[in-house]
Amino acid sequence: MDYKKGEHSPSSSIQILSDDATINSNYAYGEQLQSNDQYNNIQHPAPSFANPFIHEQDDSYSDILEEEPDEDAYDSPERPSSTEEFISQDESNISAGSSFMFPYNRGHPLSKRHDSIMVDEFGHEYIVEGDSIASADEAIDYDALYASWTAETKAPILAIDIENIYIELAMKFGFQWDNMRNMFDYLMVMLDSRASRMTPQEALLTLHADYIGGPQSNFKKWYFACKMDQFDLKSGVLSFISRDPSTQVPYKDMSSCEALWISRMDELSNYERIEQLALYLLCWGEANNVRFMPECLCFIYKVAYDYLISPSFKEQKNPAPKDYFLDNCITPLYNLMHDQQYEIRDQKYVRKEKDHASIIGYDDINQMFWYSKGLKALLLSDGSRIMDADVASRYFLLADIQWQRVCYKSFRESRTWLHFLHNFSRIWILHISVFWYFTVYNSPTIYTPNFHYLEGTQPARAAKWCAPALAGAVASFISFLALILEAYFVPRNNPGAQPVIPRLIFVSILIALNIVPAAFIFGFSNATQQHYRSREIVGYVHFFFSIGCVAYQSFIPLPFLLGPRFKFRSSSRKYLANSYFTNDIASLPWGRTLLSAALWITVFIAKFVESYYFLTLSVRDPIRFLQRMKPYDCYDFMIGASLCSHQPKFLLSLVYLTDLVLFFLDTYLWYMLISTMFSIAYSFYMGSAIWTPWRVIFSNLPRRIYFTLLAYKDLSTEFKPKIYVGQIWNSIMISMYREHLLSLEHLKGLLYQQVGSEYFGKQTFQSPKFFMEAAKGLNKWDAFFRRNSEAERRISFFAQSLGGKIPDAVPVPKMPSFTVLIPHYGEKILLSLREIIREQDPMSRITLLEYLKQLYPNDWDNFVQDTKLMAGDVGVEETKSDVKSEKGKKQGTVKEDLPFYCIGFKSTAPEYTLRTRIWASLRSQTLYRTASGMMNYSRALKLLYRVEQPNLLDDCDGNFERLEHQLEQMAYRKFRLCISMQRYAKFNRDEYENAEFLLRAHPELQIAYLDQDPSEDGEEPKVYATLINGFCPFENGRRLPKYRIRLSGNPILGDGKADNQNMALPFVRGEYLQLIDANQDNYIEECMKIRNVLSEFEEMDCATLTPYTKKGNARHPVAMLGAREYVFSENSGILGDVAAGKEQTFGTLFSRSLALIGGKLHYGHPDFLNTIFMTTRGGVSKAQKGLHVNEDIYAGMTALQRGGRIKHCDYFQCGKGRDLGFGTIINFTTKIGTGMGEQSLSREYFYLGTQLPFFRMLSFYYAHAGFHLNNVFIMISMQLLMLVFVNLGAMYHTVEICDYQAGAAINASLYPPGCYMLKPVLDWIRRCIISIFIVFFISFLPLVVHDLLEKGVIRAVARLCKQIFSLSPMFEVFVTQNYANSIFTNLTYGGARYIATGRGLATTRVPFSVLYSLYTGSSIYLGSRLIMMLLFGTMTVWTTHYVYFWVTMFALVICPFIYNPHQFSFVDFFVDYREFLRWLSRGNTKGHAHSWIGFCRLARTRITGVNRKVKGSPSNKLTMDMPRAGLRNVIFTEVFLPACFAFFTICAYTFMNSQPGLEDKSRAVNGFIRIWIMAALPIAISTAALLILLMFSCMLGPLLRKCSKRYGAVLAALAHAVSVFGLVFTFEALWFLEAWSFSKTVLGCIVIFAIHRLVFKLVVVFLLPREVASGENNYSWWDGHWFGRKGIPYMPIQFIREFMCKVVEMNLFAMDFILSHCILFSLTPILCIPFIDIPHSVLLFWLHPSRQIRPPIYTRKQNQLRRRTFYRYSLLFFALLCTFVAMIVVPLVLDQKLSYQFKFENSVKFFRLMQPSLGVLPNTNKNTSE
C-alpha cells in the first residue's frame, strides 16, 4: 500500500531495478523466454552497488531500496518552483511497500492469469475460447478487453450487441467469419481508444463522422462528387440524405442536399451508426487489392448499404453463400487488375510487355467512380446499366458488371520527359523567361543592324526594349505546349478532363500580342524608324506587358488561367470530384504562408542578382565577339567552308545552352542555402540546438521530464516530483546498461539512489551525481559516459529534445491506441552463429563479429564483463573497475578469458551462444533489432502507467501478478506491433526458428503473412492473409492462425512492399499507425514521448459540438506526422558516413523547413499516419508495378491532395540503418532515381504540379523533382562544357588569339591583326567551372550545419575533414551521375523495380569484372569520353581551373575501384586480373552467368527487347519483365543525343584540320573524309575477320567440334584479338596522318568513338530484331552448329541478325578491352606504393591501423595456386602495360629518327588524307570580326 503523510514503515521498500518495463529486454532472457526450455536458464545479472539498501532478489522481482518518508515530503501540489526541487538532496518521502518505483516484467505463466489454459506438445501455453484460437486479449470478457466501452462507462451500445450486428451482416452478405471477427475487434479497439478520452457517445459520434458522415469523411465527399444524392433522390428509396422517400428537393441544389445529409446523419440512431461502421469495415477488411481504390470501395459499400436498409435484407432468412462478397464483389475487380499485367504462357503467368500508358491501373479504375458519368457507364452482361436497376438488387448485380468493357485509361503515364515540361511549366516559364530577359539584353549585337565592333554600334531604344520583351511570347509558348500535352495526357473521354481549347485560344492571343510589337519594330521598321519616339513607346508597352504575361503565367496554375474552375457553384458539380480528390489542399496558416513567401522571395532575389552579375555579364563579351566572328581562309577539300566558316556560331550555341543550364543550377544552390538558414533559425526558435549551454540542458532535465513526459496535471500530489522523475530516469539508464552502452561504474553515477540521512530510520532519495555536476556547471562527463559514445548521443539528444515546444502528455489510459507496422520480405531476422563467426565470402578478410568488435569496442568490453559475471568467471571487485585499456586488457587476460573476448562465450550452451548472436544482431541491420526496439513502446507505456498510478498495487490488493497483468493489459490496449512477413509460410528452417524466437521473446507481437492451400487440379491455389502471435498454439509444428482471411488471389501485383503493407492493414489496431522499415531501431527514452507525439494529431480534446451541425469541425485533419531519424550506421566508414549524412540532413534539416512551408510529404520510415484518414483514402502507399516503386511518397501526395495536413516532429527520433557498401549505396540511389522517373509520369505529379499555389509548388518541386533534375543539369552542364572545351580548343590551337583586357573600351581594335578574340570565352569557362564546383560542394553545407546544431563545432569540422580526406567529394560526383543516369534511363527504357540494396557490412572485395560491368553504362563510359575531351582541352587551351575537372572526370571512372575494399592488395590485384580476363573471354560456346558477352547482350536487350515466343531457358541475366523501350524515347536518347555529340565534335575536328589562314584553297586536304575513313577502318577489319572465321566455323566446325570442345572459344578469342588490333592500328594510322600531332589525334579519336557510338546505336535501334533469350545464336556463330540446335527460330533472319550483332560486339569488345586496361594501368601507381592496403582500409573503414583487418588465411594448396597465378598474370599485365606505353613512345622516337616531312606534296600521295604540318597561319590583312 502507499503510505500517506505522516506514515512510514521501517521496512518499506521501493523497486529500483526492473527488466521489461524499464529496460530494453534484449538481454532479459529469463523473462522473455519462459516458454522455451532451452533458454530457461539464461538470466541477466543485475548490477550490484556498494549500498546497504540494495540486495539481490529472485528472478521475478528486482532489487529494492528502502526509505522512510519525511513528514513534509509531499507538501506542494503545484509545479515545483525551481529546478532544485528536482535535483536537491533533501529527504524525499518514499511510500513504504507500494513498489511503485518500477512495474514488473511479463513472464508469469498464463495459467496464473487465466483459467482456460491448454498446453501444446512443446509445453507452450495458450488460451482457448470455444473452438477458436484466441490470444490473451480474447480470453477475457469484453469489459476487460475494451475497458472504456462498457455498461459502467455508459456505452450507448454494448460490445456483445455490436458483435451480434457483425454476425448478422457477415451471414447475410457473405463475409468471411475471420474477417468478421477481425473487423469486430478492429472497431472495438477504435471505440475503446476514443472512449478513453471522451464519453462513449462522443466516441461513436466522432468515429462515425470520420468514416461516414463528417465534413472531412471521404465517403461523404465521394457521395456528393459522383452525385449519388441525385441517384438516391431519383430512386425515391431510403438513402443517406432522406429519411422520407417523398422528400422533394431540386436535384442540382447542393446546399439543400447537404442539409438533408446533415439532418440524416444527426437523426441516426446509435444502432444505425454502428451498423454503417460495421458494414464499411467488413467491406474494407475483405477488399484486399481493392483497398487501393477508395472511391470504388465507397461505391461497393453504398450498394451493400442500400441492400441492408431494404426490406429484402430483413426478409432474408438463409445466410449468403460462403465467401459471397469476396467472390462476387471483389474478385472480378482483382481479376481485371491481374489480367492487365499478366498473361499465360506455357501454363505460367508472365508479365505482359506493356508500359503504364497501356495498363488500366488502380487509379484508372478508381477515378471512374469519381463521376456520375462513370457510374452510369457500369454495364451488365445483358447490356443494361447497374444504376438503372432496383436499388436493393444492385448488390447482387456487382458480379455481373463487365469490368473489362467499362474501365478505361483516365490518365496516360506516357514515358517521356515532356511530363516535366507540363507538370512544372511555371518553373520553366519563370527561369527561361528571366534568362531571356538577361541574355537578350546583353546580346545587343544580335538585334543591332550594321553592327561593327570598331564603331561600337548600339541598338535603338525600341529594339533594346522589344527584343527582351519577347520573353512574354516564350512564356506563352511554353504554356501553349503544356496545354497540348495536357490534352494528350488526360484523355478527352475522362469526365474530369478540363476543356483545353479555351485556354489554348487565350494563350495564343498572348503569343500574338507579344509577337506583333516585335514584328512591327524589327520587321516593319528600318534602322532609322526604330529610333522614333512612337517606336520607343511601343517598346516600353511591349516590355511591361511581357513582364505581366510572365508573372501571370508563372504564378497562376495552368488549369486556372481562365479562372478557378474547381470552385463549384451550387448549380454545377462538374469539377467537384477534382476539387475533393486532387486539389483539396489544406491552406497554411498566415504566419507559415508569409514564411514560405519570404523564403522563396529571398531565394529568387539572391538567385537573379547572382545569376545576372556572375553568369550573364560574364557571357556578354563572348556573345559580342562570337556572334560577329567570321573565320577566314578555312577550307576542306571535300566540303569546302560549309562547316568551318560557321565554327564560331556552333561555339556560341553551346555557350548559350550551357549558360541556360547553369541558370537552372544555381536556383537549387540558393534554395539549399536559404532553406538551411531557415531551418537553423527554426531550430534555435524551438530550442533544439546544441548551442544551448549543457549546464542549462542537463540541470533542467529533471524538471523537463516531469512537465513533459509525465501527465503532471493528473499526478498524485502525495509524492514529490523527484520521485516520479527518478523512476523514469533510472529506467533509461538501466536500459542503456542492459544494452551494454554503459559500464557498471558509469551507471552508478547516473542513477537516483537512496542514501542514509541524518534522521534515524529515514532514507533520502539522492539525485545522480550527473545532475549535481551539471547544476554546478562542471564539465566532467567522462565520469558518466565515454565521449562520442552512443550513450552520450542518446542522453544528449534526449535532454535537448525536451527543451523545445512539446504538447503535454495525457494519462496513459486516455491516450489513443496505435500500431507499429513493419513490412518484411527477405531481411535478416536474427544473425546465426555461422554468419557471425565465419567469413561469408572468399574475398572477405574478416568475420562479422570481428568487424563489429572493432566498430563497438566499448560495447564489446561491457558485454564480455557482463557475460563473465553471468558465467561466474568474474568477481565483484572486477566489476567495479572501469574497462581496461587495450594494452592492460591483453596483459591482464588469462587464457581462460580468451574465448570471451574472441567470440563472447566459453560454453557452447545455447543460452551463451544466443547472447552473442543477439549482441551482433542488435548492432546490425536486422529485424530483431527493429522489433526489439519497437517493443520499447510497450515497456514505456507500462512504466509510465505504473509511475503515474502509485496506488495501482493497492488496487490489486498487493498482488504483484495481478499488477503485472493489469500493466500488460493496458499496454496491449494502447500499442500493437505487427510485422508483415510476406514470406513467413515459405521460410526455411533457420528463418522459421528466428521468427519463432521473436514470438517467444515478445508473445504479443503479431505476424501477418500470406498462406495458401495446396492447389487442386485445374484450380489456382487459394491465398489467405493470416495473422499469428506468440499465444497461438502449434499444430504439426506450425502455429495455428488467429485470423485467416481468404484473398482473391496473390495480392503481390506490384513491386511487393506496398502490397505487403496493404495485406497487413486489416490486422493493425488503433487510431494511428507508425510505418517502420525492417532496419530501424527505437529507444526506451524516445518511446516515453509517444503520448506527446500522438498529441500532435490534434485529436486529444473532447468534441464540444456534434460533427453533424453546420458549425461542426471542418478543419483539415493531420494526416501524417514526420519524425527525425538517427542513422546508426554513420560510424561504419566513409561510405556509411556519407549515406548517413544524406539521410540525416534530409530527414531532419530539410524536413523541418519543408514542414513549415508546406512541402513535406511521406517518406516511409518513421512517420506516423492517421489510420482512419489514410485507410479511407487508399491506404498507406500505392502499388502499381513499376509506377509506384517509391511507394511511400505517394501516400504523402495523396494526403496532400485530399485535404490532409503533414507535420514534422523534431523532438522524436528513431534509429535507422543505411547502406554501407559502394554497391548497395549506388543501388539505393538507382532505386530512388528510377522511382523519381516513375513519379514524374504519375497523375499525382500532374495534379500537384499544375494546381498547387505558386510558393508551395516551388517547395514541392525543389524538395523532390528539382533535386533529381538538378543532378541531371549538373551532368549536362559538364558535358556541354566539355564540348565547349573541344570546339574552343580546336580554334585556340589553329588560329592567332587576340590580346584581351576586361576593362578595354567596347570599340577597341583587335591586336594582333587577323586574330580571333577567344579569351573572353575562356574567362567565361573559368566562371562556369567555379559555378559547378560551388554547386557540388554546397551539398556538404547541410551536413555541416546539421552537425554544428546537433554535435558542436569540433565534431562537425572533424567529420567534414574526415570526409574530404576520405575522398568523399569524388564519391559525391559519382552519386550525382548515378542519380542523373537513373532518371535518364528510366524515362527512356522504363523497367523501374524495387532493388534490394543489402544491409550488411561492406568488407568484401568485389572483383574488377563485376564493378566494370555494373558501372560502365552508368558512369565509366561517360567518364572516359569526358576525360578524352578534357585531355584535348588541356593540351590546346589550358587553365588551372581544369584541375577540378580532372578530379571530377577521374571520379566518374575510378570511384568504384577506389571504394572497393582491398582493391590495392598486391597479390589479390593480379588474381583478380585473371578473373577479369576470363570474364572477357567466356560465354561464347556455353552459357555463363557472368561474362562479357552476357553483359553486352543485356545492355542491348533494353532497346531490342526479348523474343518471348521462343521457348528455352534464358541465359545470363536477360529479363522477361522489362518491356521493350518505346521507339520515340530510344530515338531521342540513343540516336539524337549521340548525333548531336558527333556533330559538334566533327565540327571541331573539321575546323582544326581546315588550315585557317591558308589562302591557297588548292592546297586544302581531305580532313572530313579522313576521319570517316578512320572511323570505318576498325569496323572493316573486324568485319573481314568475322567473315573469314565464319567460313572456318561453318566448314570445319562439324569436324573440329568432335576433336575439341574449345574450338568455338578459340575462334572467338582470335576474332576479339583482331578487333583489338584493328582499333590500335587505327589509332597509330590516324596519329601518322595527323603529322604526329597528339592533340589532333586525340580529337580524332573522340570523333571516331562518337561516330562508332552513333552507328552502333543506329544498327541496334533500327536493324536488330528482338533478342533470343537462350543465347543459342551466339554459340552457333562460333562453333558453326546452326542446324538442329534448339532455340534458333527463323534461321536465315537470325543469321543476318547475328552477323550485325557480331560486327557491333567486336568493336565494343575492343573499346572495352582498351578502356578496362587503361583503368587498371591508372591504378597501378597506387598499387605499387608499399603497404598501401593499410592506409586504403583506414580511408574506407575509419579503423585505426592497430585494428586493421587481418590478411586471409589460405591452405598450402591455395597459396601455391595463388602464387602461380600471381606470377603468370602479373607478367602478362606488365607486358601489356609496356605495350601500351610503346604505342605512344615508339612513334615519337621514330619521328625523331626518320624526320619524315609532312608537306602538302606528300599529302597528295595519300589522296590528301595526310595533314600537312603548317602551324598557325594568321592573315594580318583580314579581320575575324565586323
Swiss-Prot record:
Keywords: Glycosyltransferase, Membrane, Phosphoprotein, Transferase, Transmembrane, Transmembrane helix. It is found in: Membrane. It is an enzyme of class 2 (transferase). The keyword Hydrolase does not apply. It is a multi-pass membrane protein. Residues 34-90 are annotated as: Disordered. The chain crosses the membrane at residues 427-447, 465-485, 504-524, 543-563, 597-617, 637-657, 660-680, 1272-1292, 1329-1349, 1375-1397, 1417-1437, 1438-1458, 1531-1551, 1571-1591, 1607-1627, 1642-1662, 1701-1721, 1770-1790. It catalyses: [(1->3)-beta-D-glucosyl](n) + UDP-alpha-D-glucose = [(1->3)-beta-D-glucosyl](n+1) + UDP + H(+). Residues 34-43 have a biased composition (Polar residues). Its EC number is 2.4.1.34. GO terms for molecular function: 1,3-beta-D-glucan synthase activity. The modification Phosphoserine is found at residue 885. One of its GO terms (biological process) is fungal-type cell wall biogenesis. One of its GO terms (cellular component) is fungal-type cell wall. Residues 59-75 have a biased composition (Acidic residues). It comes from the Eukaryota. Component of the 1,3-beta-glucan synthase (GS) complex, composed of at least the alternate catalytic subunits bgs1, bgs2, bgs3, and bgs4, and a regulatory subunit chr4. Belongs to the glycosyltransferase 48 family. Alternate catalytic subunit of the 1,3-beta-glucan synthase (GS) complex. Synthesizes 1,3-beta-glucan, a major structural component of the yeast cell wall. Required for cell wall biosynthesis and cell elongation. This is 1,3-beta-glucan synthase component bgs3.
